[in-house]
């Protein structure tokens, strides 16, 4: 059996200059494929609210739903570090209440770490969690749970003050004990600067090549949304015509009584 990745391994990978590979997953079947490909970190993101549930934002996702999906993903991962994304409203009620939520989430889901959004305002909470054996991955930049405060899904850190705030937030999270930080939707130069200033790794999504690792939403990189994927996504499969074509072929064969054939039937 392969050695399971833990949060300290991510720090070691940064120290050795080894890029960290991360992807999202939301179910057992895709988690098995991702894990078999030696992905280092599997994030069960609250992005499932959009790509699985069909919401316009991540905000409607509940902690119970995150636990449900993470439990399925954890069953499919033998090596990858499984991280549960704490949904909107589960980390904003102070360190003690957040600890209760996070401890329950890890206990019931099988996750080995949790992710939460926010910088200096969340530093006390991050410290409280890490002091109590809950590994934390931070998330800065275009944090989806703040979509309404941002006025939409907009690139962050473009002016000097905003860039400095992100850099200060990253340092605060590191000092609070975060094991890694996701940098999303910020200029590549800023992401590289932040990455070089930290001893913990950064994992970028729409943040350029200067981060210590990369993460993508798996449905985006598999091309399951046609032309709706963000600019920073590279499609490694054009999934809509491939999967849509397979479904269409099945429909036609059933309607034409071409399926099932004797090869797919039982005689006795």
Curated annotation (Swiss-Prot):
Where does it live in the cell? Cytoplasm
- Organism expressing this protein natively: Magnetococcus marinus (strain ATCC BAA-1437 / JCM 17883 / MC-1)
Name the cofactor(s).
Mg(2+)
Name the UniProt record assigns to this protein: 3-methyl-2-oxobutanoate hydroxymethyltransferase
Q: List the disulfide bonds.
A: none
Q: Which NCBIfam families match?
A: panB, PRK00311.1
What residue ranges are annotated as transmembrane? none
The metabolic or biological pathway listed in the UniProt record of this protein is: Cofactor biosynthesis; (R)-pantothenate biosynthesis; (R)-pantoate from 3-methyl-2-oxobutanoate: step 1/2
Catalysed reactions, as listed in the record: 3-methyl-2-oxobutanoate + (6R)-5,10-methylene-5,6,7,8-tetrahydrofolate + H2O = 2-dehydropantoate + (6S)-5,6,7,8-tetrahydrofolate
Relay the cofactor remark from the entry.
Binds 1 Mg(2+) ion per subunit.
Gene Ontology BP annotations? pantothenate biosynthetic process
Q: Which residues form the active site?
A: 184 (proton acceptor)
Stated role = Catalyzes the reversible reaction in which hydroxymethyl group from 5,10-methylenetetrahydrofolate is transferred onto alpha-ketoisovalerate to form ketopantoate.
Quick one: which residues bind 3-methyl-2-oxobutanoate?
A: 46-47, 85, 115
**Residues that, per the record, bind Mg(2+):** 46, 85, 117
What GO terms fall under cellular component here? cytoplasm
Q: What interactions and quaternary structure are annotated?
A: Homodecamer; pentamer of dimers.
Its keywords, alphabetically, are:
Cytoplasm, Magnesium, Metal-binding, Pantothenate biosynthesis, Transferase
Q: Which domain of life is it from?
A: Bacteria
Provide the GO MF annotations for this entry: 3-methyl-2-oxobutanoate hydroxymethyltransferase activity; magnesium ion binding
Check the record and name the Gene3D superfamilies matching this protein.
Answer: Phosphoenolpyruvate-binding domains (3.20.20.60)
Q: What family is this protein classified in?
A: Belongs to the PanB family.
- Could you tell me the gene encoding this protein? panB
EC number(s) from the headed UniProt entry: 2.1.2.11
């Amino acid at each position: 059996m392969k050695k399971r990745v833990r949060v300290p391994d991510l720090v070691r990978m940064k120290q050795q200059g080894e890029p960290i590979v991360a992807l999202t997953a939301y179910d057992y079947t895709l988690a098995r494929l991702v894990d078999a490909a030696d992905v280092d970190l599997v994030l069960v993101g609250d992005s499932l609210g959009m790509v699985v549930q069909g919401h316009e934002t991540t905000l409607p996702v509940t902690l119970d739903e995150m636990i449900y999906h993470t439990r399925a993903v954890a069953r499919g991962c033998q090596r990858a570090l499984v991280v549960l994304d704490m949904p909107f409203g589960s980390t904003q009620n102070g360190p003690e209440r957040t600890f209760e939520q996070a401890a329950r989430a890890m206990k019931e889901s099988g996750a080995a770490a949790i992710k939460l959004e926010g910088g200096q305002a969340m530093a006390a909470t991050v410290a409280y969690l890490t002091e109590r054996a809950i590994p934390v991955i931070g998330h800065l930049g275009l944090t989806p749970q703040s979509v309404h405060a941002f006025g939409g899904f907009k690139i962050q850190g473009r002016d000097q003050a905003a860039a400095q705030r992100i850099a200060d937030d990253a340092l605060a999270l590191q000092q609070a004990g975060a094991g890694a930080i996701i940098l999303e939707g910020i200029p590549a130069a800023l992401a590289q600067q932040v990455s070089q200033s930290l001893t913990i790794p950064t994992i970028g999504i729409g943040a350029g090549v200067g981060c210590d690792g990369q993460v993508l939403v798996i449905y985006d990189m598999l091309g399951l949304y046609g032309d709706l994927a963000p600019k920073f996504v590279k499609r490694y499969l054009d999934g809509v015509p491939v999967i849509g074509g397979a479904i269409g072929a099945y429909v036609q064969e059933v309607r034409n009584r071409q399926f099932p054939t004797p090869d797919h039937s039982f005689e006795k």
